[in-house]
Amino acid sequence: MKISISWLREFLPNFSCETVSLVERLTFLGFEVEGVEESASLDRRIVVGRVLETEPHPNAERLTLCLVDVGREEPLRIVCGAPNVRAGMVVPVATEKAKLQFPDGQTLTIKPSKIRGERSQGMICAADELGLSNDHSGVMELESSWEIGKPFADYLESDVVLDIAVTPNRPDVLSHLGIARELADGAPLQYPSQQSLTYQPAGERIAINDAVACPYYTGVIIRGVTIRESPEWLRKRLQAIGLNPKNNIVDITNYMLHALGQPMHAFDCAKLAGERIAVRSDCQAEVVALNNLTYKVEGGMPVICDGSGAIAAIAGVMGGMASAVTESTTDIFLESALFHPSMVRRTAKKLALASDSSYRFERGVDSRMVQQASATAVALILELAGGTVECAMEQGSVAADLQLLALRPERTNKLLGTALSGEQMVELLERIGFRCVEQTTEQLLFAVPSFRVDVTAEIDLIEEVARLYGYNAIESSRQMATIYPTKRQHPAYFPDFLRGELITLGFREILTNPLIKRNDAALASEQLVDVLNPISEGLEVLRPSLLPGLLKVISHNIRHGNRDQKLFEVAHVFEAKPQVQQTQQPLEGYCEQERLVMAITGSRYLRRWNHPTDMVDFYDLSGAVEMLLEQLNILDKSVVNIYTPSALSIDVFLTEKGKRTTHRLGIMQPVNAAWLKHFDIEQEVYCAELDVALLERCYQPTSAYEPPSRFPVVERDISFIIPEGVSAQSLVELVQSSNPLIKTVTVFDRFERNHESGKECSIALSLTIADAKATLQDEKINDILATISRNAESKLGAVIRQV
């Protein structure tokens, strides 16, 4: 959002601040300044001149010979191509050696030259040639009272434009008024003059058919307006923030949006059937918007219709061409309204149509600014376009009372680490429009201004106190510091990091009670930890496994209609040590571990006409576990082994102090029938339980980046006959370690058959081979394949299958 400092002074006449200090101040208030644009400083060799004489160019019909007084002894002879140049005009003149910078970045240095055979000693400038606007219709005409020969730059108002990043929760500062409030420090703001209007009930002239989409709507009919170019001051205001002026009516509505933050729209009354307005959200039609593009409006999108039902505007987003103000317009209907944020956002997103209006309505506008902005705009229209007000109407209502919130000074100081008094907090908040309506030693009661739609709870008030007091002014406090155990490395707290990874895999977290029933716990272990003083029956032992609690949740969800579930929990489990009697040494009588349990059950996909209703199986679970291990950079040093006839174990290899050891990370299995029956579950459930501490030990926070080879990558397929008992994983690891040029090894086929010598198993591998330094030759590739063959035969007894 762009903010002009000179425009800001309309609200704060005495505001003065160096640009660097202002940027720093806004940053500490929570508004990042992304860019600073200073008005271009014109070359002082561009001066004010007066055209003394003009005559047609003898060799060109469209050129004029001008004699121009620039305050020197002799006037300058200048060739000009502008159609509006005439004797007596006061104009900006670029004299010899003056430098002009055009909007496209190109520069021009003025020097004496001949144009179609006639000498020219300078250049009479148009506005776009000076970087003041995009107008190239003719040379600029200056005030006749300006001193001839004086640098033109001395008559220009210098300005600084800030490009401010506003967070989505602060729509109140999406205007010059909003920024002025933040910078005022309690000083009174100077508002633009308003027309005295009395808004009468609209009756049938304004109908709101969807009060949710539009709770409040005002309209003012003005007769006899004259559509013309806006005055220079208004054009400059809009140009400073990057807008192109259109005409006085449209420019005023744009001015109101950026000055006060209230989007407005003007309709041509002659193009509104019956001069009536209806706000609806049940239309299905096409509409041509002001950008000359056609949009298909669907049900649920709020629109503005006229008396015939034709769409005149997309509510809160953009007006329609059918009712647009043009040069022939004489009567206008001025809209100022309140539209529902989420409905405007949904409409703008579906139509892929964003505008300055939708940007503000999506975030929330000040409900009490609707009438104020309307009255201000009417005053400007009467001043700049003439006409008379026929009527001012309203339909709907806004909340009469402001929201009240309590702030406890003691809690505020405790959270912020400050020692502010209640009076100081009142002074800070009243600077930006809050009003203290009741004050006691325990709490302060504030009326929240209508423009602060983001302040809904006490913590929001506390945040405002911190922001206004200054985060940099809050002293560091050791008591406020959070100290994590020294063994924690990046990420700061591994279980939370693990939770985030599982959520990205589509699992939902559950939290279950660590105290469970004895008969539930007995399914998982016989070494139970009894609670000496249970709070109730059914909560007498600590859980030895996370699985009972998880199955209880699954059973509950199934009974309530949710059969498709992907759940996880990260929590502690407890198991008794049989050699220690718990009654004598309770703290030493058990061991505690942090575990992760994952479970899936139900359909693989949502039930759709184009999807089979396949149920999840063991491979869905193992795939999710593999993806988790890959996210943690553990997959390449893990292996899956047979644990029991119905379960697989996940083992990982750790190399510590030069010695490689194998550790059991956890198991994956279908939940057995006895457990399912115990928890009244009649569908298959697949689960995995992993050791969180071991996951953290194995976790590699970063992966070394290896740039892709600039040389061609070679792919080869190779098939082995492997002896019974040799796993495919061991074959993959052996092939991978045979040569560093082998980048990937994947299994793409497995085949078994009965042979004379017994069962024969064939494993087919796909290899990717790449060299970062050179193109691989056939000889080198054949050597790599030969090495693989020798290693496989000597170490695993695997031989290449002959076709």
From Swiss-Prot:
Subcellular location(s) per record: Cytoplasm
Cross-referenced PROSITE patterns: B5, FDX_ACB, TRBD
The keyword Repeat is assigned to this record: no
Signal peptide positions (record): none
GO cellular component: phenylalanine-tRNA ligase complex
Enzyme class: ligase
A GO molecular-function descriptor: tRNA binding
Primary localization class, coarse: cytoplasm
Keywords assigned by UniProt, alphabetized: Aminoacyl-tRNA synthetase, ATP-binding, Cytoplasm, Ligase, Magnesium, Metal-binding, Nucleotide-binding, Protein biosynthesis, RNA-binding, tRNA-binding
NCBIfam families reported for this sequence: pheT_bact, YtpR
Protein name, UniProt field: Phenylalanine--tRNA ligase beta subunit
Organism name: Chlorobium chlorochromatii (strain CaD3)
